[in-house]
């Protein structure tokens, strides 16, 4: 294959992968040579080469074989001359020293947009989120750094992003002189990749290490992405060394994020780790009552019958976003048809949402989730083996089956290899004891319960 053929092949790939993927991952690749059935391509960085190898290699190989059927394998490598040409370039910049890090203008930080609705005033506090709210308020005061990082975690729709935005809003109001950078972990990765591709890593490092407060949402996104984790790790350390505040959110506790490097997990756990628990009935009702007052600004004549909000708070229990979305839809529908929001209208308008909220969790689903979580075969967990590595997950699955399904103890026992109901009862009791004594068991139960409810 020739370089001209590679250019034609790239155009075909453009149609397949789309403009953004092509620009980021395919366009920087240059054809090198073919030898012994291996086509070698030159890439600007190891990170880009690894990403392309994992995500586009099969597609590229298919296209390459259309041009050269003898090619059986692809190789992506950084040419040896890249480092040789980039390293000497640094001394030439010594005549134009950069401004000190603390002088970096906020405009260059390009923070992600903040939702104006997500403030502390609009955050409804209840027992499930009171600790997270208190910690967020403390950080938002902008005073001395007392815990670093603040790590907020919880399931979808429990208020992590709301609190993150609220902190950023409050800091900008109280301390306008501070450089506050808020972004998602995905945006961090894309900026990192862009800097690698454009050979502007020093600019990237300077921007991220000049902030006063770094806020990263959904940190689990960088799990499994080695180069991004490494840069995040060094950025984290640099900011902590400068006594700058770091605030992170994730969908689970740092120790439970799969494919996250241990050194990164360790850093994330070294501050205050706070769990946003699933909402209870009282908190959901409070959220609905607050949202109704906001909706009345849009619909001044809004009329809601007694019992409707209580009904919704009972029926939609796992996700606050779904709850708020249901209320928004209901108010809009009632306004359009000119009707009072009563139980009949609510059930007609939200029939699909209410059906989805009735999804039944099965024993079999629980067994699969638990076996995956503990990395054991399902057949071993429900089989006769009594090794601790199988017995404890089995008891966890029995406990969750008892708590999250309507199955009786004998029915649960039959689904665990025909075990007697007393065995199930013993397993449930044992886990109830362990979740008080063993923090890891309690965390496993919470993580599994969330995964099953999502």
Curated annotation (Swiss-Prot):
Residue positions binding ATP: 157, 159-161
Keyword terms, alphabetized: ATP-binding, Cytoplasm, DNA replication, DNA-binding, Lipid-binding, Nucleotide-binding
Pfam family for this entry, one: Bac_DnaA
Principal location: cytoplasm
Stretch list, region Disordered: 82-108
Location of this chain's protein in the cell: Cytoplasm
GO-annotated molecular function: ATP binding; ATP hydrolysis activity; DNA replication origin binding; lipid binding
UniProt region (Domain II), positions on chain: 71-112
Superkingdom of the source species: Bacteria
Residue segments, region Domain IV, binds dsDNA: 335-454
Domain III, AAA+ region, as annotated region: 113-334
UniProt region (Domain I, interacts with DnaA modulators), positions on chain: 1-71
Domain notes: Domain I is involved in oligomerization and binding regulators, domain II is flexibile and of varying length in different bacteria, domain III forms the AAA+ region, while domain IV binds dsDNA.
Known function: Plays an essential role in the initiation and regulation of chromosomal replication. ATP-DnaA binds to the origin of replication (oriC) to initiate formation of the DNA replication initiation complex once per cell cycle. Binds the DnaA box (a 9 base pair repeat at the origin) and separates the double-stranded (ds)DNA. Forms a right-handed helical filament on oriC DNA; dsDNA binds to the exterior of the filament while single-stranded (ss)DNA is stabiized in the filament's interior.
The name this protein goes by in its record: Chromosomal replication initiator protein DnaA
């Amino acid at each position: 294959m020739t370089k001209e053929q590679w250019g034609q092949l790239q155009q075909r790939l453009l149609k397949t992968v789309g403009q953004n993927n092509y620009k980021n991952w395919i366009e920087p690749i240059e054809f090198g040579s073919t030898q012994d059935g291996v086509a070698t391509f030159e890439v600007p960085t190891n990170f880009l080469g690894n990403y392309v190898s994992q995500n586009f290699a099969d597609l590229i190989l298919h296209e390459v074989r259309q041009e050269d059927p003898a090619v059986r394998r692809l190789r992506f490598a950084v040419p040896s001359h890249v480092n040789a040409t980039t390293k000497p370039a640094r001394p030439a910049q010594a005549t134009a020293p950069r401004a000190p890090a603390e002088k970096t203008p906020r405009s260059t930080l390009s923070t992600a947009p903040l939702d104006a609705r997500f403030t502390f005033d609009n955050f409804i506090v209840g027992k499930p989120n009171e600790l997270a709210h208190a910690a967020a308020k403390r950080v938002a005061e902008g005073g001395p750094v007392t815990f670093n990082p603040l790590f907020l975690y919880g399931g979808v729709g429990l208020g992590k992003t709301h609190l993150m935005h609220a902190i950023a809003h409050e800091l900008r109001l109280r301390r306008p002189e501070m450089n506050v950078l808020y972004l998602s972990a995905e945006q961090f990765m894309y900026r990192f990749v862009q800097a690698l591709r454009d050979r502007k890593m020093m600019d990237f490092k300077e921007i991220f290490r000049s902030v006063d407060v770094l806020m990263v949402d959904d940190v689990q996104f960088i799990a499994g992405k080695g180069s991004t984790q490494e840069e995040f790790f060094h950025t984290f350390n640099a900011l902590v060394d400068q006594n700058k505040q770091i605030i992170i959110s994730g969908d689970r506790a740092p120790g439970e994020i799969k494919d996250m490097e241990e050194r990164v997990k360790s850093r994330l756990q070294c501050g205050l780790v706070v769990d946003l628990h699933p909402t209870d009935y009282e908190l959901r009702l409070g959220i609905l009552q607050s949202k109704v007052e906001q909706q009345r600004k849009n619909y001044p004549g809004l009329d809601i019958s007694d019992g409707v909000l209580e009904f919704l708070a009972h029926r939609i229990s796992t996700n606050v976003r779904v709850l708020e979305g249901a209320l928004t839809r209901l108010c809009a529908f009632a306004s359009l048809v000119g009707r009072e929001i009563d139980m009949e209208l609510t059930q007609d308008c939200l029939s699909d949402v209410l059906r989805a909220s009735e999804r039944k969790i099965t024993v079999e689903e629980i067994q699969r989730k638990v076996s995956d979580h503990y990395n054991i075969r399902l057949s071993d967990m429900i089989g006769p083996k009594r090794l601790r590595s199988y017995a404890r997950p089995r008891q966890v699955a029995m406990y969750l089956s008892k708590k999250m399904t309507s199955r009786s103890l004998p029915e649960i026992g039959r689904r665990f290899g025909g075990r007697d109901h007393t065995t199930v009862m013993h397993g449930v009791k044992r886990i109830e004891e362990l979740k008080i004594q063993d923090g890891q068991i309690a965390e496993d139960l919470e993580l599994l319960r969330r995964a099953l409810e999502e």
